């Protein structure tokens, strides 16, 4: 059977379910696909299909994730659901499944629990921009006052982590009843789909963002000058435009005098393309792998930042022993390793394999960075952790 062609007729948005264990994330995921496939087409996915999540690797880390897709009235959604709490943490820190918004599932029977808080905090740290709340298991709570109390608690928790708690949509529903086809509860899933469409704005596509190309290789071509190669991460580079070379050394400006792909000359290079960029008047030894080409002023070099880090367990090929303050591994950003030292939060003496931790990192060389940039932690080329820049400091 030939693969059917993917028709991109609606805007595409990435979302995921987050929340405490057993609050109904996977049941809700199944209910969304089931209810929406009846109304807007697409295929329903059963609970056990989603729950048996396949293993995938992201930045050397094994994560179990289930990917489902569905249509709402106005959009196409790719939705990620993770079976285990550790999988969520890894997923959010590595950015394996980037989310434009998240559906926070809270059981009305329990209210917010420790992982509810942890997922909201992680969402804030790793840059999940929007959260919608699905108050689940409402069929099991008769007391209106209790529901209002739980709602208030959730709003307070969101506000505590700088999400707009008072304005966050909260849908009261029952994922199980909706999955069983009860029309009263099915309508709540439709309500949720409407909030997904209206509350999560369409993200800015990579091609519309300021130009950025992480440099992978540098060549000198006699009679033509210096060419850098790499995959355009964001934006567009046109022949004749000024660019900055940022990171490791002092920032310099130059002009793009040519763009080529597969030995053909182009007028421009776009996000997602592997290109060679010819630079005017730049010497081969002035540029190195690990720097970036960028639109002038759009990104700056930094050495010190706060980060959220997941440390690989021994089973994942990570360290067998804990590390302490003063630990100096390499931090792998985009295309290169830079040595750095760490500071642990007050009262924390050591970090065990399998932990996730907030740490402040100081690099020996500056790297072009902004909040949300992902990195790996390595020792002699072996990945021992994954992290995300939560706040640039210096």
From Swiss-Prot:
Keyword Iron-sulfur: no
EC class name: hydrolase
Keyword Glycoprotein: no
Positions of the UniProt region annotated as G4: 136-139
GO cellular component: cytosol
Enzyme Commission (EC) number: 3.6.5.3
Chain ranges of the tr-type G domain: 10-204
Residue span of region G5: 174-176
Protein name (Swiss-Prot/TrEMBL): Elongation factor Tu
Species, as recorded: Buchnera aphidicola subsp. Acyrthosiphon pisum (strain APS) (Acyrthosiphon pisum symbiotic bacterium)
Native organism taxonomy: Bacteria, Pseudomonadati, Pseudomonadota, Gammaproteobacteria, Enterobacterales
């Amino acid at each position: 059977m030939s693969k059917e062609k993917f028709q991109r007729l609606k805007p595409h948005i990435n979302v995921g379910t987050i929340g405490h264990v057993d609050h109904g994330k996977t049941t809700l995921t199944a209910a969304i696909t089931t209810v929406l496939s009846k109304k807007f087409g697409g295929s329903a996915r059963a609970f056990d299909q989603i729950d048996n999540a396949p293993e995938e690797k992201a930045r050397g880390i094994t994560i179990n994730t289930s990917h489902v897709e569905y249509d709402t009235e106005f959009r196409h959604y790719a939705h990620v659901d993770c079976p285990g709490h550790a999988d969520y943490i890894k997923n959010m820190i590595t950015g394996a499944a980037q989310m434009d918004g998240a559906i926070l599932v809270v059981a009305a029977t329990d209210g917010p629990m420790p992982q509810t808080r942890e997922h909201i905090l992680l969402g804030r740290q790793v840059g999940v921009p929007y959260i919608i709340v699905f108050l689940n298991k409402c069929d099991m709570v008769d007391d209106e006052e209790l529901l209002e109390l739980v709602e208030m608690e959730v709003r307070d928790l969101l506000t505590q982590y700088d999400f707009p708690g008072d304005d966050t949509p909260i849908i009261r529903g029952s994922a199980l009843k909706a999955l069983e086809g009860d029309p009263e509860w099915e309508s709540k899933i439709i309500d949720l789909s409407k909030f997904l469409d209206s509350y999560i704005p369409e993200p800015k596509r990579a091609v519309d963002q300021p130009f950025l190309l992480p440099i992978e290789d540098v060549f000198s071509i006699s009679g033509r000058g210096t060419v850098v190669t790499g995959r355009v991460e964001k934006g567009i580079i046109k022949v004749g435009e000024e660019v900055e070379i940022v990171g490791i050394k002092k920032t310099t400006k130059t002009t793009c005098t040519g763009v080529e792909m597969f030995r053909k000359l182009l007028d421009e290079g776009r996000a997602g393309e592997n290109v060679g960029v010819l630079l005017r008047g730049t010497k081969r030894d002035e540029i190195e792998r690990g720097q970036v080409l960028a639109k002038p002023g759009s990104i700056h070099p930094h050495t010190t930042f706060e980060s959220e880090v997941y440390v690989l367990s021994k089973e994942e090929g990570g360290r067998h022993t804990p590390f302490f303050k003063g630990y100096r591994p390499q931090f792998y950003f985009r295309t290169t390793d830079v040595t750095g030292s760490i500071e642990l939060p007050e009262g924390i003496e050591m970090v065990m394999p399998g932990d996730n931790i907030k740490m402040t990192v100081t690099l020996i060389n500056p790297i072009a960075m902004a909040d949300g940039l992902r990195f790996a932690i390595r020792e002699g080329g072996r990945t021992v952790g994954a992290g995300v820049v939560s706040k640039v400091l210096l």
